[in-house]
Swiss-Prot record:
The gene is pth. This is Peptidyl-tRNA hydrolase. Pfam families: Pept_tRNA_hydro. GO terms for cellular component: cytoplasm. It comes from the Bacteria.
Length: 184
């Protein structure tokens, strides 16, 4: 069983913003896996299904990014998921737009949503897929809550598909394989 959480902010006003790239990947995964992420549970929109004999739980926390740990903590404890089967997908301002990075574990890198998750799970030992949103030209809040520039949209669309494929590869072949295949 896997719990896969994409970080983002709820509400129409945040759709398409840099901070919501995790939600975009969950939507792409749901499409690829034939799932609907519409049930409200664990302070999240949830989709449940099966893939290659594994139960898959997709989460879009509705707590706002900075409190994402609350939603993930509830789901992980309910399902008794080992942390190596918890995959978190989120935006990273330190990666160029459209780049993805997969890691087995690590710090928050200053991402407040990840700070919340690490604090509440009491561990940094879970896989994550980071999607580059580029360095802010202005203040950080305006950057992460801003929409992608027209010139960035193709890169992000491709990165969302690639990140979804990377998550599927983690499930099918393990994180080491996915890291060697998708980390550029």
């Amino acid at each position: 069983m896997y719990v896969i959480a994409g970080l983002g902010n709820p509400g129409r006003e945040y759709e398409g913003t840099r901070h919501n790239v995790g939600f975009m990947v969950i939507d792409e995964l749901a499409k690829k896996l034939g799932m609907n992420v519409t049930k409200l549970k664990f302070k999240s929109l949830v989709g449940e299904g099966n893939f290659k004999g594994e139960k898959i739980i997709l989460l879009k926390p509705q707590t706002f990014v900075n409190s994402s740990g609350e939603a993930l903590y509830d789901a992980v404890n309910f399902y008794k998921i080992p942390l190596e089967n918890v995959i978190v997908i989120y935006d990273d301002k330190d990666l160029d737009v459209g780049k993805i990075r997969i890691r087995k574990k690590g710090s928050s890198g200053g991402h407040n949503g990840m700070n919340s998750i690490i604090y509440l799970l009491n561990s940094e030992e879970f896989p994550r897929v980071r999607i580059g949103i580029g360095k802010p030209q202005k203040d950080l809040v305006s950057h992460v809550l801003g929409k992608f520039e027209e010139s960035e949209k193709k890169l992000i669309d491709e990165a969302v598909i690639k990140a979804a494929d990377a998550v599927i590869d983690i499930i099918e072949n393990g994180i080491e394989h996915a890291m060697s295949k998708f980390n550029g």
